[in-house]
Amino acid sequence: MKYKRIVFKVGTSSLTNEDGSLSRSKVKDITQQLAMLHEAGHELILVSSGAIAAGFGALGFKKRPTKIADKQASAAVGQGLLLEEYTTNLLLRQIVSAQILLTQDDFVDKRRYKNAHQALSVLLNRGAIPIINENDSVVIDELKVGDNDTLSAQVAAMVQADLLVFLTDVDGLYTGNPNSDPRAKRLERIETINCEIIDMAGGAGSSNGTGGMLTKIKAATIATESGVPVYICSSLKSDSMIEAAEETEDGSYFVAQEKGLRTQKQWLAFYAQSQGSIWVDKGAAEALSQHGKSLLLSGIVEAEGVFSYGDIVTVFDKESGKSLGKGRVQFGASALEDMLRSQKAKGVLIYRDDWISITPEIQLLFTEF
Protein backbone atom coordinates (compact mmCIF):
# COMPACT_ATOMS: atom_id res chain seq x y z
CA MET A 1 0.00 0.00 0.00
CA LYS A 2 1.70 3.18 -1.21
CA TYR A 3 -0.55 5.70 0.53
CA LYS A 4 -1.61 4.36 3.93
CA ARG A 5 -2.43 7.66 5.64
CA ILE A 6 -4.51 9.96 3.43
CA VAL A 7 -6.09 13.35 4.09
CA PHE A 8 -9.05 14.18 1.86
CA LYS A 9 -10.29 17.74 1.52
CA VAL A 10 -13.84 18.13 0.24
CA GLY A 11 -14.98 21.61 -0.72
CA THR A 12 -18.44 23.15 -0.53
CA SER A 13 -19.02 22.82 -4.27
CA SER A 14 -18.49 19.05 -3.98
CA LEU A 15 -21.15 18.76 -1.26
CA THR A 16 -23.97 20.99 -2.43
CA ASN A 17 -26.96 21.11 -4.75
CA GLU A 18 -27.35 23.80 -7.42
CA ASP A 19 -29.17 26.05 -4.92
CA GLY A 20 -26.22 25.89 -2.51
CA SER A 21 -27.90 23.59 0.00
CA LEU A 22 -26.27 20.41 1.31
CA SER A 23 -26.64 17.37 -0.95
CA ARG A 24 -27.23 14.30 1.20
CA SER A 25 -26.60 12.01 -1.75
CA LYS A 26 -23.14 13.54 -2.26
CA VAL A 27 -22.34 13.16 1.44
CA LYS A 28 -23.47 9.53 1.28
CA ASP A 29 -21.25 8.86 -1.72
CA ILE A 30 -18.24 10.35 0.09
CA THR A 31 -18.83 8.26 3.22
CA GLN A 32 -19.22 5.08 1.17
CA GLN A 33 -15.85 5.68 -0.45
CA LEU A 34 -14.27 6.47 2.91
CA ALA A 35 -15.69 3.22 4.29
CA MET A 36 -14.25 1.18 1.43
CA LEU A 37 -10.82 2.73 1.86
CA HIS A 38 -10.99 2.31 5.64
CA GLU A 39 -11.89 -1.37 5.27
CA ALA A 40 -8.93 -1.76 2.91
CA GLY A 41 -6.59 -0.63 5.69
CA HIS A 42 -6.10 3.07 5.01
CA GLU A 43 -5.88 5.64 7.80
CA LEU A 44 -8.14 8.52 6.81
CA ILE A 45 -8.82 12.13 7.74
CA LEU A 46 -11.59 14.13 6.11
CA VAL A 47 -11.36 17.93 6.05
CA SER A 48 -14.86 18.94 5.10
CA SER A 49 -16.47 22.23 4.22
CA GLY A 50 -20.25 22.48 4.04
CA ALA A 51 -21.32 23.69 7.49
CA ILE A 52 -22.86 26.88 6.12
CA ALA A 53 -24.57 24.96 3.32
CA ALA A 54 -26.03 22.51 5.84
CA GLY A 55 -27.33 25.23 8.15
CA PHE A 56 -28.60 28.25 6.25
CA GLY A 57 -31.89 26.64 5.20
CA ALA A 58 -32.71 25.63 8.77
CA LEU A 59 -32.44 29.30 9.77
CA GLY A 60 -34.88 30.36 7.07
CA PHE A 61 -32.42 31.79 4.56
CA LYS A 62 -33.55 31.27 0.97
CA LYS A 63 -29.99 31.12 -0.33
CA ARG A 64 -26.45 30.97 1.01
CA PRO A 65 -25.92 34.16 3.08
CA THR A 66 -23.18 36.66 2.35
CA LYS A 67 -22.96 38.61 5.63
CA ILE A 68 -20.37 37.39 8.13
CA ALA A 69 -22.80 37.13 11.06
CA ASP A 70 -25.30 35.19 8.93
CA LYS A 71 -22.54 32.84 7.79
CA GLN A 72 -21.41 32.27 11.35
CA ALA A 73 -24.94 31.54 12.55
CA SER A 74 -25.51 29.17 9.63
CA ALA A 75 -22.21 27.40 10.36
CA ALA A 76 -23.15 27.02 14.04
CA VAL A 77 -26.38 25.24 13.06
CA GLY A 78 -24.96 23.39 10.09
CA GLN A 79 -21.86 21.93 11.72
CA GLY A 80 -23.93 19.56 13.83
CA LEU A 81 -26.21 18.67 10.93
CA LEU A 82 -23.24 17.99 8.64
CA LEU A 83 -21.50 15.80 11.20
CA GLU A 84 -24.74 13.88 11.78
CA GLU A 85 -24.85 13.03 8.07
CA TYR A 86 -21.28 11.74 8.10
CA THR A 87 -21.65 9.90 11.41
CA THR A 88 -24.89 8.17 10.49
CA ASN A 89 -23.55 6.92 7.17
CA LEU A 90 -20.25 5.72 8.62
CA LEU A 91 -21.90 3.92 11.53
CA LEU A 92 -23.81 1.82 9.01
CA ARG A 93 -20.37 0.35 8.20
CA GLN A 94 -19.37 0.16 11.90
CA ILE A 95 -16.88 3.00 11.51
CA VAL A 96 -16.47 5.62 14.23
CA SER A 97 -16.01 9.25 13.24
CA ALA A 98 -14.85 12.18 15.36
CA GLN A 99 -15.41 15.92 15.03
CA ILE A 100 -12.46 18.27 15.43
CA LEU A 101 -12.86 22.03 14.93
CA LEU A 102 -9.61 23.92 14.47
CA THR A 103 -8.48 27.51 13.99
CA GLN A 104 -5.17 29.02 12.97
CA ASP A 105 -4.35 29.51 16.65
CA ASP A 106 -4.21 25.73 17.05
CA PHE A 107 -1.18 25.77 14.77
CA VAL A 108 0.46 29.00 15.95
CA ASP A 109 0.38 28.04 19.65
CA LYS A 110 2.84 25.18 20.14
CA ARG A 111 0.98 23.63 23.09
CA ARG A 112 -2.31 23.57 21.20
CA TYR A 113 -0.50 22.23 18.14
CA LYS A 114 0.89 19.37 20.22
CA ASN A 115 -2.52 18.64 21.74
CA ALA A 116 -4.19 18.53 18.31
CA HIS A 117 -1.47 16.23 16.99
CA GLN A 118 -1.83 13.85 19.93
CA ALA A 119 -5.62 13.72 19.60
CA LEU A 120 -5.43 12.97 15.88
CA SER A 121 -2.79 10.29 16.47
CA VAL A 122 -4.97 8.48 19.01
CA LEU A 123 -8.02 8.64 16.74
CA LEU A 124 -6.12 7.24 13.76
CA ASN A 125 -4.49 4.51 15.83
CA ARG A 126 -7.92 3.52 17.16
CA GLY A 127 -9.39 3.24 13.69
CA ALA A 128 -11.60 6.34 13.81
CA ILE A 129 -12.00 8.81 10.96
CA PRO A 130 -11.47 12.41 12.16
CA ILE A 131 -13.74 14.88 10.38
CA ILE A 132 -12.19 18.33 10.55
CA ASN A 133 -13.47 21.78 9.78
CA GLU A 134 -12.48 25.31 10.68
CA ASN A 135 -14.46 26.77 13.54
CA ASP A 136 -16.45 28.99 11.19
CA SER A 137 -18.95 30.09 13.83
CA VAL A 138 -16.35 32.12 15.74
CA VAL A 139 -13.41 32.78 13.39
CA ILE A 140 -13.96 35.63 10.93
CA ASP A 141 -10.74 35.39 8.92
CA GLU A 142 -11.23 31.70 8.32
CA LEU A 143 -14.37 32.40 6.27
CA LYS A 144 -12.22 33.98 3.58
CA VAL A 145 -10.92 32.26 0.46
CA GLY A 146 -8.71 29.26 1.10
CA ASP A 147 -9.84 28.36 4.62
CA ASN A 148 -10.08 24.58 4.45
CA ASP A 149 -7.55 24.30 1.64
CA THR A 150 -4.88 25.66 3.94
CA LEU A 151 -6.24 23.73 6.91
CA SER A 152 -6.08 20.41 5.09
CA ALA A 153 -2.44 21.03 4.14
CA GLN A 154 -1.59 21.96 7.72
CA VAL A 155 -3.29 18.82 9.03
CA ALA A 156 -1.59 16.62 6.42
CA ALA A 157 1.79 18.04 7.42
CA MET A 158 1.01 17.68 11.13
CA VAL A 159 0.17 13.96 10.91
CA GLN A 160 2.85 13.25 8.28
CA ALA A 161 0.28 11.96 5.80
CA ASP A 162 1.32 9.90 2.80
CA LEU A 163 -1.01 11.85 0.50
CA LEU A 164 -3.26 14.91 0.49
CA VAL A 165 -6.17 14.83 -1.96
CA PHE A 166 -8.18 17.91 -2.96
CA LEU A 167 -11.60 16.92 -4.30
CA THR A 168 -13.04 19.78 -6.31
CA ASP A 169 -15.21 20.58 -9.32
CA VAL A 170 -12.10 21.05 -11.48
CA ASP A 171 -10.06 17.96 -12.36
CA GLY A 172 -6.64 19.45 -11.76
CA LEU A 173 -4.47 22.43 -12.63
CA TYR A 174 -4.71 23.71 -16.19
CA THR A 175 -2.47 25.96 -18.25
CA GLY A 176 -5.51 28.25 -18.61
CA ASN A 177 -9.16 28.38 -17.66
CA PRO A 178 -10.69 25.21 -19.17
CA ASN A 179 -14.15 26.80 -19.06
CA SER A 180 -13.16 29.53 -21.52
CA ASP A 181 -9.90 28.46 -23.17
CA PRO A 182 -10.16 25.41 -25.49
CA ARG A 183 -6.36 25.26 -25.65
CA ALA A 184 -6.00 24.82 -21.88
CA LYS A 185 -4.27 21.58 -20.93
CA ARG A 186 -4.18 19.84 -17.59
CA LEU A 187 -0.78 19.45 -15.93
CA GLU A 188 -0.51 15.86 -14.75
CA ARG A 189 2.70 16.16 -12.71
CA ILE A 190 4.19 19.24 -11.06
CA GLU A 191 7.72 18.90 -9.71
CA THR A 192 8.07 22.42 -8.24
CA ILE A 193 5.57 25.12 -7.36
CA ASN A 194 6.90 28.38 -8.78
CA CYS A 195 5.58 31.71 -10.07
CA GLU A 196 4.59 30.14 -13.39
CA ILE A 197 2.44 27.58 -11.59
CA ILE A 198 0.92 30.32 -9.44
CA ASP A 199 0.01 32.29 -12.58
CA MET A 200 -1.76 29.26 -14.04
CA ALA A 201 -3.86 28.89 -10.89
CA GLY A 202 -5.84 32.08 -11.47
CA GLY A 203 -8.46 30.37 -13.65
CA ALA A 204 -11.31 27.97 -12.99
CA GLY A 205 -13.31 27.98 -9.80
CA SER A 206 -16.82 27.81 -8.40
CA SER A 207 -19.08 30.49 -6.92
CA ASN A 208 -20.43 28.30 -4.12
CA GLY A 209 -17.14 27.55 -2.38
CA THR A 210 -14.61 29.90 -0.83
CA GLY A 211 -11.53 28.03 -2.03
CA GLY A 212 -10.23 28.66 -5.56
CA MET A 213 -7.41 26.95 -7.42
CA LEU A 214 -4.89 29.55 -6.29
CA THR A 215 -5.47 28.75 -2.62
CA LYS A 216 -5.13 25.05 -3.37
CA ILE A 217 -1.76 25.64 -5.01
CA LYS A 218 -0.53 27.70 -2.08
CA ALA A 219 -1.82 25.02 0.29
CA ALA A 220 -0.03 22.42 -1.81
CA THR A 221 3.18 24.32 -1.12
CA ILE A 222 2.74 23.78 2.62
CA ALA A 223 2.15 20.08 2.09
CA THR A 224 4.89 19.37 -0.45
CA GLU A 225 7.49 21.38 1.47
CA SER A 226 6.55 19.22 4.48
CA GLY A 227 7.08 16.01 2.53
CA VAL A 228 3.44 15.28 1.63
CA PRO A 229 2.51 14.81 -2.05
CA VAL A 230 -0.72 16.42 -3.25
CA TYR A 231 -3.35 15.29 -5.73
CA ILE A 232 -6.02 17.62 -7.17
CA CYS A 233 -8.87 15.79 -8.88
CA SER A 234 -12.58 15.98 -9.65
CA SER A 235 -15.23 14.97 -7.13
CA LEU A 236 -17.80 14.48 -9.90
CA LYS A 237 -16.89 10.83 -10.57
CA SER A 238 -18.49 8.29 -8.24
CA ASP A 239 -15.22 6.57 -7.28
CA SER A 240 -12.88 9.57 -7.37
CA MET A 241 -11.56 9.09 -3.80
CA ILE A 242 -10.78 5.43 -4.34
CA GLU A 243 -9.15 6.10 -7.69
CA ALA A 244 -7.07 8.93 -6.19
CA ALA A 245 -5.77 6.55 -3.51
CA GLU A 246 -4.87 4.06 -6.23
CA GLU A 247 -3.40 6.72 -8.58
CA THR A 248 -5.87 5.84 -11.32
CA GLU A 249 -7.91 9.07 -11.19
CA ASP A 250 -7.25 11.85 -13.70
CA GLY A 251 -5.85 14.92 -11.99
CA SER A 252 -2.74 16.92 -11.13
CA TYR A 253 -0.06 15.37 -8.92
CA PHE A 254 2.34 17.59 -6.96
CA VAL A 255 5.60 15.92 -6.01
CA ALA A 256 6.68 16.16 -2.36
CA GLN A 257 10.11 17.48 -1.46
CA GLU A 258 12.43 14.55 -0.86
CA LYS A 259 13.53 15.92 2.50
CA GLY A 260 10.32 17.28 3.95
CA LEU A 261 10.41 19.69 6.86
CA ARG A 262 10.17 18.01 10.25
CA THR A 263 7.61 19.26 12.75
CA GLN A 264 9.80 21.94 14.37
CA LYS A 265 10.84 23.32 10.98
CA GLN A 266 7.22 23.28 9.77
CA TRP A 267 6.20 25.37 12.75
CA LEU A 268 9.01 27.85 12.12
CA ALA A 269 8.28 28.13 8.40
CA PHE A 270 4.51 28.37 8.37
CA TYR A 271 3.16 29.31 11.80
CA ALA A 272 5.71 31.01 14.06
CA GLN A 273 5.07 34.73 14.39
CA SER A 274 8.11 36.97 14.23
CA GLN A 275 8.72 39.37 17.12
CA GLY A 276 11.61 41.28 15.61
CA SER A 277 14.03 41.77 12.73
CA ILE A 278 17.76 41.12 12.44
CA TRP A 279 20.00 42.43 9.64
CA VAL A 280 23.22 40.56 8.89
CA ASP A 281 26.32 41.11 6.77
CA LYS A 282 27.19 39.25 3.57
CA GLY A 283 29.25 36.58 5.32
CA ALA A 284 26.51 35.72 7.79
CA ALA A 285 23.90 35.71 5.01
CA GLU A 286 25.93 33.16 3.04
CA ALA A 287 26.56 31.06 6.14
CA LEU A 288 22.83 30.86 6.84
CA SER A 289 21.42 30.43 3.35
CA GLN A 290 24.15 28.45 1.60
CA HIS A 291 26.05 26.51 4.24
CA GLY A 292 23.45 25.70 6.91
CA LYS A 293 25.42 27.38 9.68
CA SER A 294 24.27 29.04 12.90
CA LEU A 295 23.97 32.82 13.11
CA LEU A 296 26.93 34.23 15.04
CA LEU A 297 26.70 37.53 16.88
CA SER A 298 29.69 38.78 14.91
CA GLY A 299 27.66 38.75 11.69
CA ILE A 300 24.83 40.95 12.98
CA VAL A 301 24.66 44.52 11.69
CA GLU A 302 21.57 45.74 13.51
CA ALA A 303 18.42 44.57 15.30
CA GLU A 304 14.90 45.92 15.58
CA GLY A 305 11.88 45.04 17.71
CA VAL A 306 11.08 43.97 21.24
CA PHE A 307 11.83 40.28 21.71
CA SER A 308 12.93 37.99 24.51
CA TYR A 309 14.97 34.82 24.83
CA GLY A 310 13.27 32.05 22.86
CA ASP A 311 11.24 34.37 20.62
CA ILE A 312 11.19 34.09 16.83
CA VAL A 313 12.76 36.79 14.64
CA THR A 314 13.10 37.30 10.90
CA VAL A 315 16.61 37.69 9.50
CA PHE A 316 17.42 39.90 6.51
CA ASP A 317 20.47 40.35 4.31
CA LYS A 318 21.50 43.96 4.95
CA GLU A 319 23.03 44.36 1.51
CA SER A 320 20.09 43.10 -0.57
CA GLY A 321 17.23 43.60 1.88
CA LYS A 322 16.10 40.04 1.15
CA SER A 323 14.42 37.95 3.84
CA LEU A 324 16.64 34.95 4.60
CA GLY A 325 14.50 33.08 7.10
CA LYS A 326 13.31 32.84 10.68
CA GLY A 327 14.84 31.51 13.87
CA ARG A 328 14.65 31.27 17.66
CA VAL A 329 16.97 33.68 19.47
CA GLN A 330 19.27 32.93 22.38
CA PHE A 331 19.25 36.52 23.65
CA GLY A 332 16.58 39.15 24.18
CA ALA A 333 16.63 42.49 22.37
CA SER A 334 18.14 44.52 25.21
CA ALA A 335 20.93 42.01 25.90
CA LEU A 336 21.68 41.77 22.20
CA GLU A 337 21.84 45.54 21.88
CA ASP A 338 24.36 45.74 24.73
CA MET A 339 26.55 43.06 23.16
CA LEU A 340 26.47 44.69 19.72
CA ARG A 341 27.32 48.06 21.24
CA SER A 342 30.42 46.61 22.89
CA GLN A 343 31.75 45.58 19.45
CA LYS A 344 33.14 42.43 21.04
CA ALA A 345 30.11 40.26 20.50
CA LYS A 346 30.87 36.54 20.54
CA GLY A 347 28.58 33.56 20.58
CA VAL A 348 25.49 32.37 18.73
CA LEU A 349 22.19 34.21 18.36
CA ILE A 350 20.35 31.48 16.42
CA TYR A 351 21.45 27.85 16.28
CA ARG A 352 20.96 26.06 12.97
CA ASP A 353 18.48 23.59 14.52
CA ASP A 354 16.33 26.60 15.46
CA TRP A 355 16.50 28.11 11.96
CA ILE A 356 14.48 27.78 8.76
CA SER A 357 15.60 29.29 5.46
CA ILE A 358 12.86 30.88 3.37
CA THR A 359 12.97 29.07 0.03
CA PRO A 360 11.40 30.65 -3.08
CA GLU A 361 8.53 28.17 -2.72
CA ILE A 362 7.84 29.13 0.90
CA GLN A 363 8.20 32.82 0.04
CA LEU A 364 5.30 32.45 -2.39
CA LEU A 365 3.03 31.67 0.57
CA PHE A 366 3.59 35.16 1.94
CA THR A 367 3.06 36.92 -1.38
CA GLU A 368 -0.27 38.49 -2.29
CA PHE A 369 -1.52 37.66 -5.78
Swiss-Prot record:
SUPFAM superfamilies given in the database record: Carbamate kinase-like (SSF53633), PUA domain-like (SSF88697)
InterPro entries reported for this sequence: AceGlu_kinase-like_sf, Asp/Glu/Uridylate_kinase, G5K_ProB, Glu/AcGlu_kinase, Glu_5kinase, Glu_5kinase/COase_Synthase, Glutamate_5-kinase_CS, PUA
GO terms under cellular component: cytosol
Binding locations of ATP: K9, T168, D169, T210, G211, G212, M213, L214, T215, K216
Compartments, record wording: Cytoplasm
Main location: cytoplasm
GO BP: any one term: L-proline biosynthetic process
GO function terms (MF aspect): ATP binding; glutamate 5-kinase activity; RNA binding
The PUA domain, residue ranges: 275-355
Catalytic reactions of this protein: L-glutamate + ATP = L-glutamyl 5-phosphate + ADP
S-S pairs: none
Domain of life: Bacteria
Binding-site residues, substrate: S49, D136, N148
Functional note: Catalyzes the transfer of a phosphate group to glutamate to form L-glutamate 5-phosphate.
Similarity comment: Belongs to the glutamate 5-kinase family.
HAMAP family from the UniProt entry: ProB
Protein name: Glutamate 5-kinase
Provenance organism: Streptococcus pneumoniae (strain ATCC 700669 / Spain 23F-1)
